[in-house]
C-alpha cells in the first residue's frame, strides 16, 4: 500500500475536523437560537393566553381590581423572569409589572401597532421602541370580551436568557465534536496498526523478493 493512501486518510481527518468546527461555529448558533426562540414563544403565548382569559378578562369586566391583578401578575413575572403588561388596542398601558401605572398620567406606547404581528404571535426586538437598549422576545395574546378585542396581554422575555441557553447547547456541540474527532483518531490509529503497517511490511517483502 502506497504511503500516499495513508496521507489521504490523514488529510481527510484534518478536513473533517476543520469543516466540523466551521459548521458548528457558523450554523449551530443561529439554528439553535431560532429553535429556542420559537419554543419559548410558544410557552409564553400559552401563559399570555391564560392570563388574558382569566385575570385580564375579569379586570375588563370589573370583576376584580387592577391592584389585585397586578399582585398576581407581579408574582408570575418574578417567577418566570419576564415583564407582563396589559395594553389597550391604542397602546395605552393598563398594567405593567415593572411599575405603578398612574391613572392621571397615562403611559402610552406611541408606535404600538397590533397589526404588525399579523400571521404571528411574537416578535423579537425593542417592542415598538419600548426597550431600545435591550432586545426582547415579546408575545401578544388578545383579551376578548363580548366578542371584541379589549386589549392585549404582552409578555416580554430577555433575549439574553435565550442566548445563555444557546451558548450552553453550543458548548455541548463542541464536546460532541471533540468526542467524534477523538473516535476518528482511534480509528486512524487502529487502521495504522492493523492494516497499514502490516500491508506495508508485506509490500516491502514482496519488493525485496521480486
Segments (PLM) and residue ranges:
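Helix-start (N-cap) segments at beta->loop->alpha junctions
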Residues: 59, 144-146, 154-174
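Glycine-rich acetyl-CoA-binding "A-motif" of GNAT/NAT acetyltransferases
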Residues: 149
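Membrane-proximal alpha-helical signal-transduction linkers
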Residues: 194-210
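Cytosolic-side ends of inner-membrane transmembrane helices, especially those
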Residues: 12, 25-33, 172, 176-197
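Extracytoplasmic/periplasmic sensor domains and loops in membrane signaling proteins
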Residues: 70, 96-134
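Juxtamembrane segments flanking the first transmembrane helix
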Residues: 1-93, 98-101, 164
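A short beta-strand signature within small-molecule sensing/ligand-binding domains used
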Residues: 132-142
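The DHp (HisKA) dimerization/phosphotransfer helix of two-component histidine kinases
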Residues: 50, 161, 205-209
